[in-house]
Amino acid sequence: MSKIYNNLSIETLIKTAWFNQFDKNQKYEIMKGIEADLDVSHYSYSKFDWREMEQIRLGLEDNLDVSWYADPKYSWFQMEQVRLGLEDNLNVSIYVEENFNGHQMEQIRLGLVDDLDVLIYAKEEFDCVQMEVIRDGLENNLDVSVYANSEFDWEQMLCINEGLKNNLDISIYANPEIPVEKMKKIKEKLLRKNNSSSKFDFYKNQIIAFFNY
């Protein structure tokens, strides 16, 4: 343990008042960084808790530009979303420079990973669950413009999303003024009607095939 840091050996460093301002977990993160030859000056501040320190340390280990997120205004989870985005060479500016919480950032990052048009839902007006339902629609090539509206809550969005997946006439219930329970009943009624039509068409085709045999 003779390594030197800022002209101090580790043995001397750990005895300083500066080092002892940190709690046990923060000290661990600082020591991990020093042992890995990292520039711990990016995170060796008491304003960062140990989980935030960890995210900055992991970014430094991967040679990432931690200046994107080494800021106490971000929670550790927000920092993680930025770090993971940088690892994947994503355009993290889409979600770093806005007032998104960590879970919103996660949904935007996941959309960027899948090369989706995240600008459709990368808006503060959507919470993370609404974002997830819109992202799911984009992944399934649905016309999300029908429900990418903050006037719909996430359950209403999901009802419309499921209707689109089942080729239902969602125009009947895609209205934010319709309560979600009523939406569900309309959706189920349309599903039953579709299933009945499908069964009828199946048996009709079987009969036609039989007589044409």
Place the predicted regions along the sequence by residue:
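General marker for long, soluble alpha-helical cores
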Residues: 1-213
